[in-house]
Amino acid sequence: MERRDLFRGALAAGLFGVPQLPAQTASAADIVIERAVSGTPHKGKVLALITPHLDDGPFFAGGTVAKLLQEGYTGYFIRTSNDEKDSYDLTLGETVLGNERDAGAFLQASGLKQMFDLGYRNHRMDDLARTEIRARLIFLFRLLRVDTIFSYDPWGHYEENPDHYVTAQAVEAACWMSGGHLDMPEHFAAGLKPHSVAEKYYFARGPQLVNRVVDIGPAFETKLACLRTCRTMVTHMIKDLNASLVERKLRVPALSGVNSAAIDEFTKVALETSDRAVGRKYGLEYAEAFHHIGPEQPMNDYISRHTVPL
């Protein structure tokens, strides 16, 4: 299923009452509800949002990223593909340029500090050696001292887009290899040091082992603003939807003109539908769901009880 079909399903659910979003499967383990906290308890920590496509992060994790930035994180965006395929009626070159401009607007709206473009060809990432992508990510994790990542679930079920699962598997491997002194030791001559990524928030388009649900109510407007910067991609979704409605001899007046008003309406309905559906299960207005992997708690408890000053 293409991402635009996911949006189309969300919009159809909102407009026509037809639920079409893929359900996520909760794990048997306890699900942690993560809520906003006051102050900046995460000051000094670094997160990286790593996705192949510009709109992946805003849709699946935009609220949680905004929440953590508000709580003190410094954030970076790593885009692995060049997004050359995601437009409705533009040429390849126009598509790359449009999405590149939109990426700059997203960076500004999100509060992320910097973007790193790896520039691999969209829909062709399964041609690549994953060790190459992994090596580049190891370098960035060490350079930026990344503590927390957001990316696609490397074990997400029924994922048809190779860019998604190739990126996800490279991210997962790089997270722990970046802490090894024998992995890419030439980095150390340049002043870098081993650094493992301690925490992962994985999202998926299909069924997933969910163990962390984040209350994004306070950050929902920021998430909405971030998705609205993805104008080239959202325009693609709207035009696709309009074309399918024409085949049924239907139209939605608010979406008929592909302009800022249509983009605002489309993103509002799509995100309200999807994020409310997640939140409703847990008594929240809006929520995002993840498979979360963090530091081993028993060892953390042991350290907190037994550490002494040097």
Q: What residue ranges belong to the model's regions?
A:
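Internal alpha/beta domain cores that form substrate/cofactor-binding pockets in large enzymes
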Residues: 76, 115-201
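Histidine-centered active-site/metal-ligand motif
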Residues: 53, 161-164, 230
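Sec-dependent signal peptide hydrophobic core
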Residues: 10-15
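Residues on a specific face of well-ordered alpha-helices
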Residues: 101, 105, 168-169, 173, ...
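C-terminal accessory domains and tails appended to enzymatic cores
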Residues: 28-34, 39-43, 180-193, 205-310
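C-terminal segment of classical bacterial N-terminal signal peptides
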Residues: 17-22
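Structural signal for conserved beta-strand scaffold positions within catalytic alpha/beta enzyme cores
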Residues: 49, 79, 117-119, 151, ...
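Active-site rim/loop-helix segments in enzyme catalytic domains that contact anionic ligands
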Residues: 3, 7-9, 26-144, 299
